[in-house]
Amino acid sequence: MATREAQARWRSRHQLVKKQLNVMAKHLIHEDLEEIARDYDLKGKGEAVTFATFVTKAMRQQAEYNPEAKRIMDLLENAYKRDRDIYRP
């Protein structure tokens, strides 16, 4: 974890464009983020989170006019909600 001084410098430097996100997650999620970062040549778990939100947003946009994308999003949403206890921190 970054030192308090390093965090203060980061916040000062990026205060107008970024917000720090600290999230408690199960070990499984951390492993998944590391895998996503490795598989897509990203710069660590933070960028993997950003990529995951990018993919989700793109799929939501596709689902607005693509029935297959909507079907896949519905399946993923239902599967997550069914198994959310596995992923909950």
PLM feature spans:
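Short Lys/Arg-rich basic patches
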Residues: 1-30, 34-37, 77-87
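Short, highly charged low-complexity linear segments
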Residues: 63-65, 86-89
